């Protein structure tokens, strides 16, 4: 989905999804698509996985990111009924899509559990941690980027270990 590409021009999560889409598209009968209208993300500027426009790349103003995110979220919600897809893999933890995907498999990637382990240091991330928990329990599969993250997911969120795949080297070009 659009989330991280609305928020990041550069960054680890957007790079992860860029590389993941690039590698998945090399597999026969596999196609990825990110429903974006506006993004200034560097990694997807040369990809055919989205049909977006840069949004005032040289201008910064209050609310710019929120505006991009709102437009992209509305676009994604409108497209749910128009696209054929087999798996939904959101780029971040906003669960806005849960009432739209029906019984389609949901895969999420959890990078770490820092906000949950040290919540007193990240009070502004309480919403993100809450959403991560909701999605982890709804997900068909969870990708963890390390064994340590997997153990934290099991201990902190109470997720069955069989639901979690550790993929430390998912990205070839990273």
Mark where each language-model region is.
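Carbohydrate transferase catalytic cores enriched for Leloir-type hexosyltransferases
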Residues: 1-174
């Amino acid at each position: 989905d659009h989330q991280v590409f609305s928020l990041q021009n550069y960054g680890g999560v957007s790079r992860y999804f860029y590389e993941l889409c690039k590698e998945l598209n090399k597999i026969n009968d596999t196609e990825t698509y990110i429903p974006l209208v506006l993004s200034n993300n560097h990694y997807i500027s040369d990809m055919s996985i989205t049909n977006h426009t840069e949004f005032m790349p040289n201008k910064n103003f209050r609310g710019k990111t929120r505006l991009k995110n709102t437009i992209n979220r509305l676009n994604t919600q409108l497209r749910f009924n128009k696209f054929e897809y087999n798996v939904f893999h959101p780029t971040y933890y906003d669960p806005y899509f849960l009432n739209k995907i029906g019984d389609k498999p949901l895969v999420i990637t959890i990078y770490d559990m820092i906000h949950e382990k040290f919540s007193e240091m990240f009070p502004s991330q309480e919403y993100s941690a809450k959403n991560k928990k909701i999605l982890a329990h709804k997900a068909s599969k969870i990708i963890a980027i390390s064994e340590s993250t997997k153990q934290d997911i099991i201990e902190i969120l109470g997720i069955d270990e069989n639901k979690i795949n550790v993929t430390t080297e998912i990205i070839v070009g990273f």
